Regions:
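Residue signature of alpha-solenoid helical repeat architecture, marking inter-repeat boundaries
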Residues: 1, 37-39, 83-85
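TPR/TPR-like (Sel1-like) alpha-helical repeat modules
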Residues: 54-75
Length: 103
């Protein structure tokens, strides 16, 4: 399966409350073959998931590459990934501000 299929399957599983399968599907989307857009979307969803779980180190692992590549992603994909880039930046900012709560 390619990244887009893993992403769609994971979103469906998460919407049905199948958390473990959804997370594994998102990880497969990030690690597998496929388009960069789907991989970026999966990274942001995983990052948000780990922020909500209070696992900020794991969240940074997925959100960091999106924030670091933001300029290139914007140049290459115009505004297609703007929402994901903004969300990654916002979540990383939250981690910086409130990370002490998880310690």
């Amino acid at each position: 399966m390619d990244a887009k299929l893993y992403l769609n399957k994971a979103i469906m599983q998460l919407s049905r409350g199948l958390e473990e399968g959804g997370v594994q599907g998102l990880k497969a989307a990030v690690e597998g073959e496929g388009d960069e857009v789907s991989k970026t979307q999966a990274r942001v969803i995983l990052g948000e998931y780990y922020v909500m779980k209070g696992d900020f180190a794991q969240a940074r692992e997925y959100l960091g590459p999106v924030a670091q590549d933001a300029e290139r992603l914007r140049d290459q994909y115009d505004d297609l990934l703007d929402d994901e880039i903004c969300k990654a930046d916002m979540l990383l900012d939250m981690i910086e501000r409130f990370g002490f709560l998880a310690e």
